[in-house]
Amino acid sequence: MDCGFCTVIAGALNNFTSSLEEEEENYEKMNRYHPLIRYQLGFHAEYTISEELLTGLAKLAARYRAPVYTHNSETAREVEECRLRHKTTPTVYLDSLGLFEYGGGGYHCVHMSREDLRIFQEKKLYAVT
């Protein structure tokens, strides 16, 4: 396909419709397809994916030295529910699993703490709003 503009596709790994194997297959296949097409590792959101899949995705990101993208802190409820599950914010939790070692970013990022912002700055993460 020759479209003449750059396209970036981010993965949406989750507990329901995809697997680590599919994520890796998409990453390898699409990043070889055309120089103007890039595939970035990603998952839907902290609340739609298991810690086991997140840990696997962090290993995949390390293998490819690749950034990871996700929906992050879109609503106050999302952040509060993450605090109940993991005793911290989505950003801190995901960073603790090694997901941002090679950069990446979050979509929305509306309800961020000072610590979240520090992590975004330190890891050079992007906020896509």
Describe each model-derived feature in a short phrase:
Residues 99-129:
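Active-site-adjacent C-terminal substructures of enzyme catalytic domains
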Residues 2-110:
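Metal-coordinating catalytic core of metallo-dependent amide/deamination hydrolases
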